[in-house]
Amino acid sequence: TLPFQRAIMNAMGSDYIREVNVVKSARVGYSKMLLGVYAYFIEHKQRNTLIWLPTDGDAENFMKTHVEPTIRDIPSLLALAPWYGKKHRDNTLTMKRFTNGRGFWCLGGKAAKNYREKSVDVAGYDELAAFDDDIEQEGSPTFLGDKRIEGSVWPKSIRGSTPKVRGTCQIERAASESPHFMRFHVACPHCGEEQYLKFGDKETPFGLKWSPD
């Protein structure tokens, strides 16, 4: 893990934090962090888990390129997956059932039917800003998805996305509803003051800027 990832993963894995919203840039490892925490939930805490992605195609690709290699590369998880690499009812493109009885689902977020029937402990959303705002006129993705964790003793909702249009972005809205907002701070190389990084422009005396050649 990288230094900025540790607090995020600690929040994702904590039973005392019910909801985590990660407003991120591209290529920060959100999907890998999410899968690492999910592996912890499945193997150690024995929780049922579910991840939604914007479309069915995204979900199938995620299962093939991220989930299956994660199972292969984590020995304790692979030990719970005797079906790995085989055609088996517990090994499909939408669901993995482990020998400890825990299930993992990976579904597309466009259809309302994908938010029904499942009862899980952990609900996750990857690239929330790319989801439809209203799923077939039944409600927002997080409204529908978080109903799946209402019966859990330790309910958890993890949302993450690169933000899109300010004011209409779902991850921005979700984060703004939280009473707590945390940023990663780094020390100034000149004075040592802890600060979070900002982009500047020609009008501001601060921030990250590009010098013309």
Over which residues does each language-model region extend?
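Phosphate/NTP-binding elements of NTP-utilizing enzymes
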Residues: T1-D213
